[in-house]
């Protein structure tokens, strides 16, 4: 089977990584050989004491990265992908994206680069007997609770950048177990149940009404097939229009 036939028969596999300074897309075939690639440069910004990327940065960046990949495929093989055998998203891990019940982002995305959660990280680490770095999502959530931030009362769910993109593409609030390990401690194939119970009590004692297993994204094993694309990424402008 030629590369063109593999592309047309969805025998290729797409990976997209949201790095700190570049969004990268790589297409491989069923022998793991690289087929095509694309990229989009971006930068975080420091706003109101927080390192962040806007939702427009995220959406536009993904569009342009994917358009760059599609253009590379077309220029090399004369075809345009209409689907893939599988795909995966990665995105710097950690960080904090908090949403209300209508999926509105409540505060600007807080990236892994922020070091504003030391009190929360220290208290959680002592409570659980497990090191919780400042960049983890649970540290950001608990710090927001400790700070008495206005948005906390409206939180329906939180996510990482990769988890957010996964939700946008599939409608599923799920992350792989590797991604989950930067949200909250994992044990086997899910969040550590003992730690969840302890953290839930701590949060409730501080006035947080949510339950972590309802607020955090679900956890999937590596290779699990639990979601499909509801669209072919986003409508993709030409990278020349960026």
Place the predicted regions along the sequence by residue.
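Active-site neighborhood of divalent metal-dependent phosphoester bond hydrolases
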Residues: 123-129
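Short, charged, surface-exposed secondary-structure boundary motifs
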Residues: 47-49, 120-123, 185, 229
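Carbohydrate-associated surface elements
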Residues: 114
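N-terminal glycine/serine-rich phosphate-binding loop of ATP-dependent small-molecule kinases
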Residues: 1-107, 122, 154, 210-217
């Amino acid at each position: 089977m030629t590369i063109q036939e593999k592309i047309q028969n969805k025998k290729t596999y797409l990976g997209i990584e949201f790095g700190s300074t570049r969004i990268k897309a790589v297409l491989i075939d069923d022998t793991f050989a690289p087929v095509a690639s694309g990229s989009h440069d971006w930068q975080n910004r420091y706003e109101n004491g927080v390192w962040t990327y806007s939702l427009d940065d995220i959406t536009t960046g993904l569009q342009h990265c994917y358009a760059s990949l599609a253009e590379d495929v077309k220029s090399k093989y004369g075809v345009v992908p209409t689907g893939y055998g599988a795909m995966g998203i990665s995105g710097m891990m950690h960080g904090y994206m908090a949403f209300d019940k209508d999926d509105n982002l409540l505060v600007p995305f807080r990236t892994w680069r922020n070091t504003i959660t030391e009190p929360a990280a220290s208290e959680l680490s002592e409570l659980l007997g497990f090191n919780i770095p400042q960049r983890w999502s649970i540290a950001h959530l608990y710090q927001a609770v400790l700070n008495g931030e206005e948005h906390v009362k409206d939180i329906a769910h939180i996510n990482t950048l990769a988890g957010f993109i996964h939700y946008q593409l599939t409608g599923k609030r799920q992350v792989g177990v590797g991604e989950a390990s930067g949200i909250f401690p994992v044990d086997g194939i899910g969040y550590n149940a003992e730690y969840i119970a302890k953290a839930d009590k701590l949060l409730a004692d501080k006035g947080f009404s949510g339950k972590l297993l309802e607020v955090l994204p679900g956890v999937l094993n590596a290779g699990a097939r639990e979601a499909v694309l509801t669209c072919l990424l986003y409508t993709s402008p030409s990278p020349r229009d960026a």
